[in-house]
């Protein structure tokens, strides 16, 4: 944690490497895949390119003087980690990511808990997008690359909405004039390339992260990420509608629903050797 001693760096966060209860269920295994992609690839790329690493809330070191200077934690924000990250950046301070320092966590074990947790993340992230997007664009202390990356990061939970809207429009257009689309079949080629490089980018991140970590057997789970992909589309649509209604009626305070944990966050689950997953 030597970075903390640097004068202009007020926040360092670590990699959430190991999901201690990964073998418990399908959900914990999929969460482990998301963690590999989000930290091993996504956050490391932001750090290497000098962009804006986003504190994920798992573990890190932040100066208390910074928190006091920024007015403390904002209790109206559901994702206080993202909120404080951008308050720190906009105030001219640095946030750094350390991939070599490993941390551990307990993942949610069922789809109900996954839904509640990701709903809070989506709502809090959208709150931050409404609150900081314009300020980020106007900030004079950030480069164009940092502003662009920050905007993409803030608005990442709107992407599932755009994907769902594109599906709806595509189906409607097809049934409105199917003959036109059959004649324009060649247009599917660039669209396919765009989908492969854009919509499916998270799946590529998982594959690259698993490769870098040497976890070959986990590749077989990547197709199952489509389950959480569709779940997150539904989550983001519901949350966006709730936020729009809240802004119309003037509601600013949201209920924080605690994530259910079973106490596996500080030790490995006591499985027999035959039950533990093996990597080759």
Feature names for model-found ranges:
Residues 106-123, 253, 258:
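Nucleotide-sugar-dependent glycosyltransferase catalytic core
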Residues 1-78, 119, 123-130:
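Long helical/loop segments within the catalytic core of UDP-sugar-dependent glycosyltransferases
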Residues 85-104:
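Catalytic donor-sugar/metal-binding loop of nucleotide-sugar-dependent glycosyltransferases
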Residues 2, 84-85, 114:
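Short, hydrophobic alpha-helical packing/hinge segments within bilobed ligand-binding/sensory domains
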Residues 18, 77, 83, 87, ...:
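Transmembrane helix-bundle signature of multi-pass membrane transporters/permeases
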Residues 134-151, 169-280:
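Juxtamembrane C-terminal module of membrane proteins
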Residues 151-166:
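Transmembrane alpha-helical segments and their cytosolic interface motifs
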Residues 114-132, 230-240:
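Intracellular alpha-helical coupling/juxtamembrane segments of multi-pass membrane proteins
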């Amino acid at each position: 944690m030597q970075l903390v001693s640097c004068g202009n760096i007020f926040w360092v966060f670590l990699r959430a490497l190991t999901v201690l209860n990964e073998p418990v269920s399908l959900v914990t295994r999929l969460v482990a895949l998301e963690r590999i992609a989000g930290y091993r690839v996504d956050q490391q790329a932001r750090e290497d390119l000098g962009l804006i690493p986003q504190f994920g809330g798992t573990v890190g070191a932040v100066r208390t003087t910074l928190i006091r200077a920024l007015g403390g934690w904002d209790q109206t924000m559901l994702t206080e980690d993202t909120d404080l990250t951008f308050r720190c950046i906009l105030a001219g301070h640095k946030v750094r990511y350390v991939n070599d320092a490993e941390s551990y966590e307990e993942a949610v074990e069922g789809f109900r808990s996954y839904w509640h947790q990701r709903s809070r993340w989506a709502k809090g992230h959208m709150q931050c997008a409404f609150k900081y997007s314009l300020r980020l664009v106007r900030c004079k202390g950030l480069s164009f690359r940092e502003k662009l990356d920050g905007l993409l990061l803030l608005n990442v939970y709107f992407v599932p909405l755009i994907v769902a809207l594109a599906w709806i429009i595509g189906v409607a257009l097809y049934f409105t004039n199917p003959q036109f689309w059959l004649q324009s079949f060649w247009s599917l080629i660039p669209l396919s390339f765009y989908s492969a490089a854009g919509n499916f980018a998270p799946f590529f991140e998982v594959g690259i992260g698993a490769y870098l970590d040497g976890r070959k057997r986990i590749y077989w789970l990547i197709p199952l990420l489509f389950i959480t992909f569709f779940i997150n589309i539904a989550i983001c649509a519901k949350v966006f509608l709730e936020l729009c209604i809240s802004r119309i009626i003037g509601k600013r305070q949201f209920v924080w629903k605690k994530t259910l944990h079973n106490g596996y966050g500080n030790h490995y689950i006591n499985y027999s050797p035959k039950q533990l997953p093996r990597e080759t």
